């Protein structure tokens, strides 16, 4: 049974989940996510390192994810990496809906051995990425490290969030990237939590996001 076939929310609660498909001449991507999950993940993007990073998002963000992608990997990973980020961002936006009642802001500092990365985000409705990672190698395995920035640009633009990634320490590319994804996951979990004191209100003094 697929994750998307299972009852993933408590009885009487509105499901904060989405299924988004996106097909282009270069890729075919499907993303299912449940913001109120338990950290289950089934990711098959054709890019093993990216699948590993989605495991981190699911596990540390307590998001249930089901992701499949078929792309022109015979050329390189760029199109698939970006389009998976786009589709994931669209699914986040759909699952959040009008964003009523959420905390909105999230931040976390994650260590992984010598690496230390800070992430702060705001579901502001204003897409922005400040990227402050310095990755010392061009690849981790077969994954091009320059694709990390493209992945987060795609998420920020399509989930309409403001995202800051700041590397505080680190010399190992794998550790830096994984710490970034873990910190992003925890920030995402914080920002998307429902604040009972909001009572379904838009978390903005303007009344709109």
Curated annotation (Swiss-Prot):
It comes from the Bacteria. One of its GO terms (biological process) is L-histidine biosynthetic process. It is found in: Cytoplasm. One of its GO terms (molecular function) is imidazoleglycerol-phosphate dehydratase activity. Its EC number is 4.2.1.19. Keywords: Amino-acid biosynthesis, Cytoplasm, Histidine biosynthesis, Lyase. Residues 1-23 are annotated as: Disordered. Pathway: Amino-acid biosynthesis; L-histidine biosynthesis; L-histidine from 5-phospho-alpha-D-ribose 1-diphosphate: step 6/9. It holds the Pfam family IGPD. Its main location: cytoplasm. It catalyses: D-erythro-1-(imidazol-4-yl)glycerol 3-phosphate = 3-(imidazol-4-yl)-2-oxopropyl phosphate + H2O. One of its GO terms (cellular component) is cytoplasm. HAMAP family: HisB (MF_00076). Belongs to the imidazoleglycerol-phosphate dehydratase family. This is Imidazoleglycerol-phosphate dehydratase. The gene is hisB.
């Amino acid at each position: 049974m697929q994750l998307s076939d299972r009852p993933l929310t408590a009885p009487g609660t509105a499901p904060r989940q989405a299924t988004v498909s996106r097909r282009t001449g270069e890729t075919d991507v499907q993303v299912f996510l449940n913001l109120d999950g338990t950290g289950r993940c089934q990711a098959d993007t054709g890019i093993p390192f990216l699948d590993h990073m989605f495991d981190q998002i699911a596990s540390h963000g307590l998001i249930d994810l089901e992701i499949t992608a078929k792309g022109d990997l015979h050329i390189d990973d760029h199109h698939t990496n970006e389009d998976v980020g786009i589709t994931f961002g669209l699914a986040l936006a759909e699952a959040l809906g009008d964003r009523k009642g959420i905390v909105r802001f999230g931040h976390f500092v994650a260590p992984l051995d010598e690496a230390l990365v800070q992430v702060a985000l705001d579901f502001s409705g204003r897409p922005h990425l400040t990227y402050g990672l310095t990755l010392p190698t061009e690849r981790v395995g077969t994954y091009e490290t320059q694709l990390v920035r493209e992945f987060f640009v795609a998420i920020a633009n399509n989930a309409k969030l403001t995202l800051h990634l700041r590397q505080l320490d680190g010399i190992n590319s794998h550790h830096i990237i994984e710490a970034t994804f873990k910190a992003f996951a925890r920030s995402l979990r914080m920002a998307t939590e429902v604040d009972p004191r909001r009572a379904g209100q838009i978390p903005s003094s303007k009344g709109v996001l």
